[in-house]
Regions:
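Hydrophobic/aromatic beta-strand patches that form the interior of the parallel beta-sheet core
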Residues: 31-33, 79, 109, 133, ...
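Beta1-alpha1 glycine-rich phosphate/pyrophosphate-binding loop at the start
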Residues: 5-74, 152, 158-183
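Short amphipathic alpha-helical segments
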Residues: 20-21, 44, 120-123, 161-163, ...
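FAD-binding core/adjacent interface of flavoenzyme oxidoreductases
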Residues: 1-10, 26, 77-146, 224, ...
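FAD-site-proximal beta/loop scaffold in flavoenzymes
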Residues: 120, 126-142, 242-291, 298-301, ...
Length: 315
């Protein structure tokens, strides 16, 4: 019979590692399962300037490495094994990994995160973290007094473009249609901002550069014409921020747990899902702000609630 853990955490990003740290520190037997590499989105961040207490030289990978160390110090196990099947009903939850191994636990914490929807153009992957970003709050400061391009036409794209005007010299909003999906009030506010330039009926065809972004090729969605825009000679680079949506990593939980219409997991303030003993933490859940600091808070709350659940249910 396989070992029954107190807590199994699915996902080793900031939320999952925070949950693992708090769970293991509370003397619960804890296993963290990750399908790819530890860290989630933050491992693509070269500098972490908005996480309280992080040292100046902190990077996404270094912050995650320290979180992993802390989990290990308190006895949490971390294993790479993508989950392919799961049963969350009943007192003991069962997960099956891609390896064929079966895992059992009294509590499951879902911390699978959400990933930015990609633009799908050549150069996007190559220059992610080198001029291409998906987070204005995380990376806007790096483009102080530079030109940036904000891609998208929804509320988030226009709001983030306005946020970028706090740093950038000029913000070009690139949208594939001639009208925004964003609320009219948000668009009107952006139109009054002198730093914002609108580039309608355009998509990103290609991003070019040598080590860093140096030019962007836009395609006119009406005429098909291509236009290459180079960074100003004095700047050498510019930013490309993609705000074309996020994809919650919840495919595994469809028809198993309650999801909202966009695929995120609704929880209460204590991270409870609709299934007793199953919690969700971090970017995967319905929330207003998706940042490392909010993900780690979610993970801590989920772990503490898990401890209370186990004490009440099994002791």
């Amino acid at each position: 019979m396989s070992k029954v853990y107190d807590v199994i955490i699915i996902g080793a990003g900031p939320a999952g590692l925070s949950a693992g740290l708090y769970a293991a520190r509370s003397k619960m037997s804890t296993l963290i399962l990750e399908k790819e590499k530890n860290g989630g989105q933050i491992v693509t961040t070269d500098e972490v300037a908005n996480y309280p207490g992080s040292v100046p030289e902190a990077t996404g990978p270094s912050l995650i490495a320290r979180m992993v160390e802390q989990c290990n110090e308190f006895g949490a196990e971390i294993k790479k094994d993508p989950i392919v099947e799961l049963s969350l009903e009943g007192d003991i939850k069962t997960l099956t990994g891609n390896s064929g191994e079966v895992y059992q636990a009294r509590v499951i914490i879902i911390a699978t995160g959400a990933s930015p929807r990609k633009m799908g153009c050549p150069g996007e992957k190559e220059f992610t973290g080198k001029g291409v970003s998906y987070c204005a709050t995380c990376d806007g400061d790096f483009f102080t007094e530079l030109e940036v391009f904000a891609i998208g036409g929804g509320d988030t794209a226009v709001e983030e473009a306005m946020f970028l005007t706090k740093f950038a010299r000029k913000v070009n909003i690139v949208h594939r249609r001639d009208e925004f999906r964003a609320a009219k009030s948000i668009v009107e506010k952006a139109e009054k901002n002198e730093k914002i330039n609108f580039m309608m009926n355009k998509t990103v065809h290609e991003i070019k550069g040598d080590g860093i972004v140096e030019s962007i090729v836009l395609k006119d969605t009406v005429t098909g014409e291509l236009e290459e825009i180079h960074a100003h000679e004095d700047d050498g680079t510019f930013g490309v921020f993609a705000f074309v949506g996020y994809l919650p990593q919840t495919g595994l939980f469809k028809d198993v747990i309650t999801l909202d219409q966009t695929g995120y997991i609704p929880t209460d303030d204590n991270m409870n899902t609709n299934i007793p003993g199953v919690y969700a933490a971090g970017d995967v859940r319905v929330k207003s702000l998706r940042q490392v600091v909010t993900a780690t808070a979610d993970g801590a709350i989920a772990a503490i609630q898990a401890e209370k659940y186990i004490d009440n249910k099994f002791h």
